[in-house]
Amino acid sequence: MLCCCVNSENNKKYAELDAKLARKMVESRSIYPGHRSLKSMDSIIMKFPKLREGLRNIRSVFESYDNDTNGTIDIEELKKCLEELKLSLSDEEVKGLYSWCDVDGSKGIQFNEFIVLLCLIYLLAKPSSESSTESREMGPKLVESIFDPIVEVFLFLDKDGKGKLNKADVIKTLNNEDYPLERSPSHVTNMRFEEMDWGRKGKVGFREFLFAFMSWVGLDDADDDFMSS
């Protein structure tokens, strides 16, 4: 009975975090105008090499805070990292995001989970107001230069602006009739959405998008692998 209560409480916390992220993505449309410059999947793929380089730099950050060199970061190591990066959230929010991103239940954050976790914290820690001078200054330039373009890709795919991706919009965007030479095969677009839609609900939140997007970008893969697989 206790286990069921704990799981229910955790699910409620995760649902609240998911809803908060969705609201943040809606608010972000005016803060990240770069999403309007994206026209097709090719324009997204062109960002992959720079993002891949940035992710390699993030690995250096990860390794510098993995004090016991076990390939994971625990909650205390994460807090030290966030303090150094000047990213501030409440302890409760950090703990909730930490467990939410520990998708394999290993009680430690691995590198791919760390990227997603750091991006979520960066996004939620930033002010929502476009007029705030801190909104473009918070956090190191390294983190901003990597995560801002990823947010813009999500906003590009989120055509209805509700903070969630739905299958019809994503497929329509990737098969944009205005760019016939850059259209993705239908089986590829369906597969890409399924990679994001873990619960097979037809809706994808920012966290699920992040995990899928990291695998698309890769750290060692060639750019054309994304379109041909």
From Swiss-Prot:
PROSITE patterns: EF_HAND_1, EF_HAND_2. Potential calcium sensor. Keywords: Calcium, Metal-binding, Repeat. The lineage of its organism: Eukaryota, Viridiplantae, Streptophyta, Embryophyta, Tracheophyta. Residues 53-88, 89-124, 145-180, 184-219 form the EF-hand domain. Pfam families: EF-hand_7. SMART domains: EFh. This is Probable calcium-binding protein CML22.
